[in-house]
Regions:
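Short glycine-centered segments of the SAM/dcSAM-binding site in methyltransferase folds
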Residues: 247-248
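Conserved binding/catalytic microenvironments
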Residues: 142
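A short acidic, Gly/Pro-enriched loop at the edge of an enzyme's catalytic core
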Residues: 126-139, 147
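A short glycine-rich, Lys/Arg-flanked "PGG" loop and its adjoining helix->strand segment in the class I
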Residues: 228-244
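Short, contiguous acidic/charged loop-to-helix segments that flank catalytic cores in large enzymes
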Residues: 218-229
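Conserved SAM-binding strand-loop segment of SAM-dependent methyltransferases
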Residues: 113-126
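Class I S-adenosyl-L-methionine-dependent methyltransferase module
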Residues: 1-110, 151-218, 239
Length: 249
C-alpha cells in the first residue's frame, strides 16, 4: 500500500498546491527554486494521506529526498554547499528518485525488531529515577568533542518537518545538547559557569587554553569544560541505569 500510494502521489505531484517554503535562512542556497518547489508540492501531497503508518514511511522518504535534491555537499566533517547553479533539474528524474527512495524505505520497514521498543524524550545527563538499575545493557553514542553541531546538520529536516521556525529555536536546542555551540549557543558560553565536578587537571588544561594568544581562547576553554562536565553527568547517569552486572557500550 505504501508504494502504491507513493506512485499515485508522483503521478499527480504537479497538481498539488505547494506548501509555504520553510523559513530556513537563505533557502535557495540549500535548494534551487525548482527543487524547493518540488519538495513543497511533495510535502503538500503527503498531507493528503490518511493512513498514519504510510505517512510515517512517506515522511522518512521525504527526508531522504530533501537531501538528495539539495545543494549540500558532504566533503567535509560539517555540511557545506555545492555551487547552487550546478546541475539540471528534471521533475521526472525527481519523481523516479523519490520512488527509488520509497522502495529502499519499504525494504527497511520489513525488518522489524523482535523486542518491544519505547521512545522517551529526556535529558541524557539525568535519567528518570524509575530507570535506575533497570537495564542489563545500555548503548550510548555521545557526541565527539569536535564542536560539530548536530542541530546544524539536521536543520534541513527540522525546518521542512516544521519542528523549527526560527534560528533561535535551533540555537536553544543546540545549547541543551552535549557539545552544542551553534548560533546563539556560542555567545552563551561566555557567561556559562563551571560546576567544578571534574578532576583538577582538566581545569588546568582549560586554563592553558584560555591563556592562548587567540581572541576565542576563553570561549574554547569554556567549551572544553562544558563538554566534559556534561559528559561526566551523562556517563554517571548511564551507570545509574545499569542493573547489577549490566554492561555499557
Amino acid at each position: 500500500e505504501f508504494l502504491s500510494i507513493a506512485n499515485t502521489l508522483m503521478q499527480h505531484i504537479e497538481e498539488y498546491v505547494p506548501t509555504d517554503f520553510p523559513p530556513i535562512y537563505n533557502i535557495y542556497r540549500w535548494w534551487n527554486p525548482p527543487q524547493a518547489e518540488f519538495l513543497a508540492k511533495l510535502k503538500s501531497a503527503i498531507k493528503t494521506v490518511e493512513d498514519d503508518a504510510v505517512v510515517q514511511l512517506l515522511t522518512v522518504s521525504f527526508c531522504r529526498i530533501v537531501i538528495e535534491l539539495s545543494n549540500a555537499a558532504f566533503n567535509h566533517v560539517s555540511t557545506s554547499f555545492k555551487d547552487g547553479n550546478e546541475g539540471f533539474f528534471s521533475i521526472d528524474i525527481a519523481k523516479e528518485a523519490f520512488i527509488s527512495v520509497c522502495e529502499m524505505v519499504a525494504k527497511g520497514a520489513l525488518l522489524q525488531p523482535r523486542a518491544t521498543s519505547k521512545v522517551l524524550l529526556h535529558d541524557s545527563r539525568s535519567i528518570p529515577a524509575e530507570c535506575y538499575g533497570a537495564y542489563d545493557t545500555v548503548i550510548t553514542s555521545p557526541p565527539y568533542p569536535n564542536r560539530i553541531s548536530y542541530i546544524r546538520e539536521l536543520r534541513p529536516y527540522m525546518y521542512w518537518l516544521d519542528y523549527l521556525e526560527t534560528s533561535d529555536q535551533a540555537s536553544d536546542l543546540d545549547w541543551q545538547a552535549i557539545g552544542g555551540t551553534w548560533g546563539r549557543a556560542t555567545s552563551l558560553l561566555g557567561t556559562w559557569k563551571s560546576d567544578h565536578s571534574l578532576p583538577q587537571y582538566v581545569y588546568d588544561i582549560a586554563e592553558k587554553i584560555s591563556n592562548a594568544d587567540n581572541k576565542s581562547a576563553g570561549l574554547m576553554a569554556n567549551y572544553v569544560l562544558k563538554y566534559f562536565e556534561d559528559m561526566q553527568k551523562h556517563l554517571s547517569s548511564v551507570y545509574a541505569g545499569l542493573a547489577a552486572k549490566g554492561r555499557e557500550f
